Amino acid sequence: MNSTSTSDVIGRRVEVNGEHATVRFSGLVPPVAGLWLGVEWDNPERGKHDGSHEGTVYFKCRHPTAGSFIRPHKVNFGVDFLTAIKNRYVLEDEPKEEETEQIVIIGNKPVETIGFDSVIKQQSQLSKLQDVSLRNCAVNGAGDKGEIAKACPNIRSIDLSKNLLSSWEEVIDIADQLKHLEVLNLSENKLTSPSSSPSPTGTFPTLKVLVLNRTGVTWAEVLRCASGWPVLEKLYLESNNIIISERPTDVLQTVKLLDLSSNQLIDENQLFLIAYLPRLEQLILSDIGISSIHFPDAGIGCKTSMFPSLQYLVLNDNQIAQWSFMNELDKLQSLHALSCTRNPLTEGSKDAQTTRQFIIARIGQLRTLNKCAIEPEERRGAELDYRKAFGNEWKKAGGHQDPEKNRPNEEFLAAHPRYQALCLKYGAPEDGELKTQQPFLLKNQLLTLKIKYPNQHDQKVIEKQLPDSMTVQKVKGLLSRLLKVPVSELLLSYESPKMPGKEVELENDLQPLRFYSVENGDCLLVRW
């Protein structure tokens, strides 16, 4: 049992054949003689019972199959922090039959030594360490007081994930000796709740990044400890079954990134409790099951006072199925980047490009969507396509090209809160843009079009047959080869006998001709 006495093992974290558990019981289990340890496994499938044996309850487990009885000699209680560091980072000299003479420099004078170099090497290796990874190294605590500070005083980043730390007090004993600590990963350590008094202010005076994924930490524990993280900027709380039960008061005010992914009990009302963290710039809400959001303090076309600094929002793997969700995100005053993959809204559509365009059009200040930058040309095309796609619905709801008569009803404005702004930006859609497309038949595939060059009087009007499925980009490519003009310089529009005096620009290179309702007999206008 690694020299650990049986009197102080309750609550200790242990490792058995690569699996981690917490000791819940130590004693006799009749009728079998000898000492047993009752453990609750992190993986409930590893156990056999709930802590009971032949009708007697020896300890309790959260899961009915998470418990086991194990002989003490099979249990690993781990090692202290410094031992783990030496095991991982100190290069031991190979054993030699005879010690060889070594030369070291003390001051400016070379000195001959025998066997002294290994001590210097160890001290040098440890004192230089800044970034330390001790993941799954069975670390159980700080060890002798002050030894960490003496051996490795320059550590700035530690990965202590999946170790045998069992309490916040053990973590504090380590951190107190590392005066430059900025990054700490405690994921997959099952830490017991701190004492009723909060962590001493200044326990982690330089800590900027704290990772507590899969630790079982509660929101109340986070707030209780947070006074000890006065300059914390990034906090990761993934997979903890967290319920946000109260608003942070005088804590977490410096946090810029908060990761609450895979906490399936969080809903929109709980999110409002963290909506006024003043410096929160990045919020990660992947896989929390959220399907709706509404900012009650902001009406149509207005910005919410909630999440005032939020720039990047991650909503992957949720249950978002309604466009109203995107409309609400437009109310966030600082939102510039959104990731929203693997949601019913984005996965249900056969046309991923159209879905992307509609998200861009609905969130006016967005600069990045799903990690892809939104260039000005893409935004313009997306907004024009969106304006056209819902133009007929806008007219039926009371929309009109004449500003004096343009009064769409409240239902339309609620469904499309940016539509009026887009009409002001680009002009209201003309009737010609809103023509109903003809059914896609074989005879409609080829269009006979005239091609004119309004600014090039020496160019003759020509006639071409083009598929109505041909994209604007491919039309430009064809004309570029024909005219010996770079694609980037070409501007396309068209006019139709059905719309005398009107000219429709073909702004989006990715759309086919039929999207713009180009028909037989229409005329392409090419400028450069």
From Swiss-Prot:
The modification N6-acetyllysine is found at K464. It holds the Pfam family Ubiquitin_2. Keywords: Acetylation, Chaperone, Cytoplasm, Cytoskeleton, Leucine-rich repeat, Phosphoprotein, Repeat. LRR repeats lie at residues 152-176, 178-206, 207-229, 231-253, 254-274, 279-300, 309-330. Coiled coil: none annotated. PANTHER family: CILIA- AND FLAGELLA-ASSOCIATED PROTEIN 410-RELATED, LEUCINE RICH REPEAT PROTEIN. GO terms for molecular function: alpha-tubulin binding. Residues 343-385 form the LRRCT domain. This is Tubulin-specific chaperone E. The modification Phosphoserine is found at S496. One of its GO terms (biological process) is post-chaperonin tubulin folding pathway.
